[in-house]
């Protein structure tokens, strides 16, 4: 009966293409121009078919190789809602499905898994009971069928089907001279108007967001007086706002950890590099020798680090991270684990001496020490190297004396001077620049690195604590290796050292939606952690809280923390679950399980959820907030991410004005403004500063913010722009860094209401804001603990600003701190000036902060 019913539906659809339409009905065509273009809609006009725009695109799998939509099929339910199915590729055992009420906003895609590796050309049909039937073909030409629930979230096991080929008959139209296949539908004029209005709004928004400060010379905002005069009326009315607005987000991206903040100078110290870390890498990457470097795994130091090198009467060299930079007179702590290997004849003395050296590019030895070892068991040996000259690029030499064989592992070299003098510590200059931000919290360890490249690469915090040799290394989603030397103990310790709240963020039971296909051909979220394994994963997250806050006398996890040198609890208050995930059914099921378990055992812990990788009106944002509001008891706040143009930030300064104050708080966890230069400059920093004045104004709903990414090492950029760039010998904060520092150091917990009024006379006599008002900003906050008040003023225009301040007493000689420059300047220097009283003068493209 199903075969007859659906064949009849196909005929009815074809007849609908030629029937005369009622006056209120409009005809649309839904199609896919090509596999990279996504789902499009066109309307019938007197001049023929006219393109309206893209409805949605594929979210499946990796960028580049995937994210393609093949053979989409669309059906409309009796209630007027829509269903979409499409083929993701020709090798994965899954279909892509999506739901929409209005063709404008689509729920995030789900990817139900089928029984065959080829799920080709799917088609979908509605049933009278509200469910849907989906048919697809296999590579061999077989046909299979699956039933979908009315909400398009539940799918039966697929079965063989005998449905006829007529089910795959498509409509064809010509648009822009090209013939395309798709589906015809009748919708009402009101529905069509809503769709076209949506695309009109998108086009207008896109146009205004193209505004750039660096274009001011040739396309200056109209009617700007010289100078600009304005008044700021401070009313004195206050409201409480978050005292944690400005923090930092640390992710091991662009060599931010190993080779960066983590002070270890030896690369591949554990001989555990593999091709999965990076194509072409092996256990000997960054090592070389006077003879071929021998690596074995018999009787290893640790099962988590099974490989080690074997030395006889030879020398091996390590290149470090683009070389090893040393300073004359500085001390460097060397260590390695050694086991002397018995000779086959049993005559070995089980003793071996080593000479450890730092060697310059011209072969000069500028530091040297001798290490004597004995015994067949693994043992740690240490030495101190003192550099006799400064050199940006040395290499480490480990020379074995005589012929006896010995295994060496975890070959390490740290500067004696680490941040706060910590063992296994952080690079002092880089950590200090971060500390100078005075961040109120630190989000770690990611980012995409938290949920990982596939299920096997999900970040497990418990693999990163304990003795270094027992920590479990892994590949990094950003294309290199994680030693885990910078682990959760070091993250928490750093937070404590700089007075910031720790905010660990871990996976919500799903990997990154951009994951490549696994052995079964399943990519993206890969179906999530199997439900049978979720209790163990949830326990792992509960153990983290126990490790951070528990009593060493009663908790094995807390005892591990105490054994590492921190008997007192870390006083963890926040935990993040998920990172810019697709808010799919697979995600929601696992996220809810995790949150309920944490809330049940640790009700005081504040959970931070996620609403996807982009702002409104993205599918994940809408679904994420809908889920959050339907489950208000699960989370304290949600994490929003968006990277946008400077024009977007300047024209969306009211973004949080209408957020529901009774709903979850907002953590703007990743954001940055950018221009075509793809580097932070004065333009991006001022756009971010303008936006942050409105974040402060909305600090009653926005709890936290953090710029992203924070760190990038020269020559290893996975992403641009970044807040801080660095090499082995220098740290280069950007204008974005200075904006973050000004808003953090001069932050408060009370917002003081004020009104900025620009003095412009309109020819019409109207009182409308001038068209350049979005380029000026001001904010007043007060720190209730210190009693200090801070005024921030931003002038993102090419003319000077004279601002008269009313309601605040600014004594003559009061210091104003800030920066200015040309929009394209990528380096700025903070300057301090004296004010002349209640009138402030700001140069073009500038920010000033006054402390009262």
Task: Give the label of every model feature segment.
Residues 771-810, 845-849:
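Carbohydrate-binding surface patches
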């Amino acid at each position: 009966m199903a075969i007859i019913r659906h064949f009849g539906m196909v005929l009815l659809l074809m007849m609908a293409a030629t029937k005369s339409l009622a006056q209120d009905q409009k005809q649309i065509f839904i199609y896919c121009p090509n596999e990279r273009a996504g789902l499009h809609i066109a309307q019938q006009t007197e001049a023929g078919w006219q393109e309206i725009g893209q409805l949605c695109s594929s979210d499946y799998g990796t960028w580049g190789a995937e994210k393609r939509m093949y053979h989409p099929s669309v059906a409309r339910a009796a209630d007027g809602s829509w269903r979409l199915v499409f083929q993701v590729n020709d090798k994965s055992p899954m279909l892509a499905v999506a739901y929409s009420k209005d063709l404008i906003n689509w729920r995030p895609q789900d990817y139900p898994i089928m029984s065959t590796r080829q799920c080709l050309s799917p088609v979908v049909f509605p049933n009278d009971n509200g469910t849907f039937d989906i048919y697809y073909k296999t590579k061999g030409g077989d046909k299979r069928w699956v039933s979908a629930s009315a909400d398009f979230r539940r799918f039966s096991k697929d079965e063989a089907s005998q449905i006829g080929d007529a089910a795959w008959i498509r409509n064809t139209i010509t648009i822009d001279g090209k013939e395309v296949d798709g589906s015809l539908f009748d919708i009402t004029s009101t529905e069509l108007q809503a769709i076209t209005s949506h695309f009109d709004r998108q086009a207008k928004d896109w146009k205004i967001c193209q505004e750039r400060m660096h274009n001011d010379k040739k396309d200056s905002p109209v009617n700007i007086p010289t100078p600009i005069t304005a008044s700021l009326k401070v009313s004195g009315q206050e409201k409480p706002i978050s005292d944690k607005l400005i923090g930092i987000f640390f992710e091991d991206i662009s060599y931010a950890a190993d080779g960066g903040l983590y002070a270890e100078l030896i690369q591949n110290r554990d001989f555990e590099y593999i091709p999965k870390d990076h194509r072409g890498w092996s256990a000997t990457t960054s090592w070389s020798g006077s003879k071929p470097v021998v690596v074995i795994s018999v009787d290893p130091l640790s099962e988590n680090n099974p490989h080690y090198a074997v030395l006889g009467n030879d020398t091996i060299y390590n290149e470090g991270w683009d070389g090893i930079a040393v300073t004359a007179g500085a001390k460097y702590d060397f260590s390695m684990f050694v086991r002397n290997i018995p000779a086959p004849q049993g005559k070995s003395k089980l003793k071996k001496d080593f000479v450890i050296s730092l060697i310059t590019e011209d072969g000069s030895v500028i530091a040297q020490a001798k290490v004597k070892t004995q015994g067949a068991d693994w043992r740690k040996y240490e030495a101190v190297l003192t550099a006799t000259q400064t050199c940006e690029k040395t290499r480490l030499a480990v020379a074995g004396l005589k012929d006896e064989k010995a295994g060496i592992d975890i070959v390490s070299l740290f500067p004696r001077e680490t941040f706060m003098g910590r063992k296994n510590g952080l690079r002092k200059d880089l950590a200090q620049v971060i500390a100078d931000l005075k961040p109120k919290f630190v989000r770690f360890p990611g980012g995409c690195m938290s949920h990982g490249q596939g299920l096997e690469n999900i970040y497990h915090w418990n693999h990163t604590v304990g003795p270094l040799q027992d920590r479990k290394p892994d590949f990094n989603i950003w294309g290199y290796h994680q030693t885990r030397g910078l682990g959760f103990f070091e993250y928490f310790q750093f937070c404590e050292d700089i007075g910031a709240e720790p905010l660990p963020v871990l996976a919500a039971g799903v990997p990154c939606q951009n994951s490549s296909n696994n052995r079964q051909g399943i990519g993206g979220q890969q179906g999530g952690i199997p439900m049978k394994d979720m209790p163990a994963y949830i326990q792992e997250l509960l153990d983290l809280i126990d490790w951070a806050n528990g009593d060493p006398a009663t908790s094995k996890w807390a005892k591990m923390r105490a054994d590492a040198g921190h008997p007192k609890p870390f006083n963890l208050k926040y935990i993040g679950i998920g990172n810019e995930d697709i808010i799919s059914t697979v995600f929601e099921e696992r996220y809810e399980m995790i949150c309920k378990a944490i809330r049940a055992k640790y009700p005081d812990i504040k959970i931070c959820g996620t609403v996807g990788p982009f702002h409104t009106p993205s599918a994940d944002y809408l679904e994420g907030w809908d889920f959050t509001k339907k489950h208000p008891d699960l989370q304290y706040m949600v994490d929003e991410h968006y990277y946008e143009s400077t024009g977007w930030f300047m024209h969306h300064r009211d973004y949080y004005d209408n957020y529901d104050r009774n709903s979850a708080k907002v953590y703007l966890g990743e954001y940055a403004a950018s221009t075509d230069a793809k580097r932070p400059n004065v333009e991006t920093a001022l756009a971010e500063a303008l936006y942050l004045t409105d974040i402060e104004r909305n600090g009653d709903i926005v709890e936290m913010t953090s710029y992203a990414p924070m760190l990038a090492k020269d020559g290893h950029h996975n992403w641009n722009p970044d807040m801080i760039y660095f090499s082995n010998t220098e740290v280069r904060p950007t204008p974005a860094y200075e904006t973050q520092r000004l808003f953090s150091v001069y932050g408060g917990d009370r917002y003081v209401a004020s009104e900025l009024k620009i003095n412009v006379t309109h020819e019409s006599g109207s009182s409308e804001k001038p068209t350049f008002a979005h380029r000026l900003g001001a904010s007043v906050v007060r720190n209730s603990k210190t009693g200090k008040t801070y005024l921030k003023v931003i002038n993102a225009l090419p003319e000077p600003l004279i601002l008269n301040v009313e309601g605040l007493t600014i004594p003559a000689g009061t210091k104003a701190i800030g920066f200015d420059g040309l929009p394209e300047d990528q380096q700025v220097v903070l300057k301090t000036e004296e004010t002349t009283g209640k009138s402030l003068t700001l140069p073009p493209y500038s920010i000033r902060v006054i402390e009262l």
